[in-house]
């Protein structure tokens, strides 16, 4: 690992759920091709949430997001608005985690147990790209990288 490579070249924004109200219909991130990465880090950022359960999961899937199967999940957050407000959930996925499913794509899902929900977003970062710089694989929606 070289300390001379900027973090913006070592990590890439490869998936997202843009800030929105998340409620009882699961919202999914952009699909990530794990053939380009050794690891993937999904970060859910919760805002002022209602007193409802919250589930954050990583799914193996096809390139179009179909045939999703739960791969990893955070422990369900209990329905407690004060405890869940302004918190983060993190899931780390390694390429080898997909071997049992035979899939090469991953997406993240976020859902609450009720209709009110609250504001949230998900950011998926590609880590340890097979080919550098990792930033070559950023989503098209990434407007700027300042190194």
What kind of region is each of these model predictions?
Residues 2-147:
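Surface-exposed, low-hydrophobicity beta-strand/loop segments enriched in small/polar/acidic residues
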């Amino acid at each position: 690992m070289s300390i001379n490579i900027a973090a913006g070249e070592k990590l890439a924004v490869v998936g997202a759920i843009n800030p929105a109200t998340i409620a009882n219909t699961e919202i999914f991130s952009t699909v990530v091709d794990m053939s380009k990465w050794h690891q993937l880090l999904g970060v859910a950022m919760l805002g002022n949430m209602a007193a409802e359960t919250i589930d954050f999961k990583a799914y193996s899937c096809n390139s179009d997001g179909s045939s999703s199967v739960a791969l990893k999940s955070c422990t369900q957050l209990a329905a407690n608005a004060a405890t869940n407000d302004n918190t983060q959930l993190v899931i780390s996925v390694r390429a080898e985690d997909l071997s049992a499913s035979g899939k090469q794509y991953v997406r993240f899902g976020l859902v609450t147990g009720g209709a009110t929900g609250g504001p949230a977003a998900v950011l998926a970062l590609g880590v340890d790209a097979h080919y550098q710089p990792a930033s070559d694989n950023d989503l098209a929606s990434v407007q700027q990288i300042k190194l």
